[in-house]
Amino acid sequence: QVPFAPRPVIPGAFVPIVSQNFDLNGVDGSYTFSYESADGSARQESGVVNAPGTPLEAQAVQGSYTYVGTDGVPVQVNYVADENGFQPVGNVVAPAISRAVAAQVAQARAEGPILPGVPTPIPFRGRPF
């Protein structure tokens, strides 16, 4: 065994996708997608661009995912990701972690940029090629 090497991932049985949907609105940057697998795992997400064309333009996403953990317990996570960061809520997300993330976002917002004069990144516009 090699020290500090990652354990190999041994794929399990093939799990078919029983439903899927993807809709991209190339005009305003909004999208939705979802899928469900035969093993009961699923994911859905939708996103919109808030304040388009302004300095406050930002992608806002909300969604959820579910699966059965290795211990047989169903896992469900709902989330929002926006200008306030990634905010997960679910039966595997400890409330203390959610509070710590919220505190970090508030602190970063209060502190402002690390270096004055560093340009603001250009917002990502998820458009097809």
From Swiss-Prot:
Domain of life per record: Eukaryota
> What are the UniProt keywords, alphabetically?
Cuticle, Glycoprotein, Pyrrolidone carboxylic acid
List of residues that carry Pyrrolidone carboxylic acid: Q1
GO CC terms on record?
A: chitin-based extracellular matrix
Q: Which Pfam families match?
A: Chitin_bind_4
Domain called Chitin-binding type R&R: residue spans: 28-98
Keyword Glycoprotein applies: yes
**InterPro entries under this entry?**
CHIT_BIND_RR_consensus, Cuticle_Struct_Prot, Insect_cuticle
In alphabetical order, the GO MF annotations are: structural constituent of chitin-based larval cuticle
Q: Which residues constitute the signal peptide according to the record?
A: none
Record: glycosylation sites: T120
Protein purpose = Component of the abdominal endocuticle.
Name of the molecule in the record: Endocuticle structural glycoprotein SgAbd-9
- The species this protein belongs to is Schistocerca gregaria (Desert locust)
What lineage, starting at the top, does this entry show?
Eukaryota, Metazoa, Ecdysozoa, Arthropoda, Hexapoda
